[in-house]
């Protein structure tokens, strides 16, 4: 435990942290990668260039300083980060490296404020937090290793199927080359993969949501080709590599499933809300629900640009007949042929299919949705999820029943 003096000194640096902002974490990453370039093989360098990861790390550091006396308030963040770390195969020996560069960053950027006493306090605080992460990650590693089909670290998998789901999304099905079983996962979790693109200076590690129900034999991920997130930004390194270079028969390193966002079994209605490639964890949940033939209402709400970009559309149409499923889709831009195709979609036997134009508006569905008792799962762009969450709150949904996943560095809604 930290001493009262250490806590006081750490809290005294909060104004310094807030005034410096992401300058601290940007400097930290530059320093660390300069002195320990081998870590570029672990960190997502695209998130470094976009500024997403420095911003996320700054938020985490500031939150830790503010809650240094109430670490229970950080339990959700610790769980989320620990899962991400296991998908990257982070080991205890990595923590002293990060701690060294964090302390050096604070010392070099604020030499007058970051006295020897303050540095000792932050060293103790970092050591405490590192211990929390190391212990939790060890629990997750051992849990994966001890389950049927489980393993530690990287395991080689072969691509046995590659299928286009839409104009932007392609699915990849992996089977282990050792022919043994694979550990089950919870619907909504993701898979860590490592690739080595030709003529690329470092390996790349990514996490992609699993998009099918567990079967003990294979894994499926569905990846959106990131041509360019916004004008002026670079195309996605790994997504384009997977789409263009990885084919059936190729072998990749895969890490066990992880992630704190997943379906939780309850006897309440389920509402799955997604936009774009955020549909992938929802598809996993939907497939799992269908396999269990649960007798409860399921709502599937999805937003995308047009029919060409609507991943899993035909599969969801089929599942509508198997579940008590109500299916709503919002499109932004349909051509004449797509509009005609939508018009031909009728009522299913056990659920309903509905299409809308424009942004997702839940107000007209107020009487239809289980606002008082349903479990709501969200995934998609942060702006979309913030927009939807605000609607749900205004419609009376309790915040504790809204669960969401952010692709990339975490952001609060």
Model-derived features: positions:
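Reductase modules of NAD(P)H-dependent flavoproteins
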Residues: 72, 298-413
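Conserved S-adenosyl-L-methionine
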Residues: 288-297
């Amino acid at each position: 435990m930290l001493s009262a003096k250490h806590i006081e000194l750490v809290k005294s640096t909060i104004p310094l942290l807030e005034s410096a902002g992401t300058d601290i974490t940007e400097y930290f990453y530059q320093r660390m990668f300069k002195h320990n370039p081998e870590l570029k093989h672990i960190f997502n360098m695209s998130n470094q260039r976009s500024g997403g990861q420095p911003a996320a790390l700054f938020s985490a550091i500031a939150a830790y300083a503010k809650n240094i006396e109430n670490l229970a308030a950080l339990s959700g963040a610790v769980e989320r980060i620990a899962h991400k770390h296991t998908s990257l195969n982070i080991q205890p020996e990595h923590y002293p490296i990060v701690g060294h560069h964090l302390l050096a960053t604070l010392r070099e950027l604020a030499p007058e404020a970051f006295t020897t006493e303050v540095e000792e306090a932050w060293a103790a605080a970092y050591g405490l937090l590192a211990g929390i992460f190391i212990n939790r990650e060890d629990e997750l590693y051992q849990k994966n290793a001890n389950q049927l089909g489980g393993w530690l670290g990287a395991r080689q998998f072969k691509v046995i199927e590659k299928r286009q789901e839409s104009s932007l999304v392609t699915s990849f099905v992996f089977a282990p080359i050792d022919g043994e079983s694979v550990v089950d996962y919870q619907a909504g979790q993701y898979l860590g993969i490592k690739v080595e693109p030709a003529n690329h200076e470092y390996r790349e590690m990514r996490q992609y949501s699993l998009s099918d129900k567990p079967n003990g034999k294979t894994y499926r991920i569905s990846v959106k080709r990131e041509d360019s997130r916004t004008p002026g930004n670079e195309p996605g390194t790994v997504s384009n590599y997977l789409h263009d270079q990885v084919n059936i028969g190729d072998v990749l390193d895969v890490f066990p499933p992880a992630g704190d966002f997943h379906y939780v079994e309850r006897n309440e209605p389920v509402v799955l809300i997604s936009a774009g490639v955020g549909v992938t964890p929802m598809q996993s949940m939907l497939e799992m629900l269908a396999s269990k033939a649960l007798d409860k209402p399921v709502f599937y709400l999805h937003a995308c640009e047009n029919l060409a970009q609507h991943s899993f559309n035909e599969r969801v149409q089929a599942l509508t007949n198997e579940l008590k499923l109500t299916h709503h889709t919002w499109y932004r831009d349909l051509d004449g042929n797509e509009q005609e195709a939508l018009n031909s979609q009728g009522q299913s036997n056990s659920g309903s299919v509905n299409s809308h134009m424009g942004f997702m508006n839940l107000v007209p569905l107020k009487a239809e949705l289980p606002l008082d008792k349903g479990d709501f799962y969200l995934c998609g762009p942060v702006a979309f999820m913030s927009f939807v969450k605000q609607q749900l709150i205004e419609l009376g949904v309790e915040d504790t029943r809204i669960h969401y996943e952010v692709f990339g560095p975490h952001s609060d809604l």
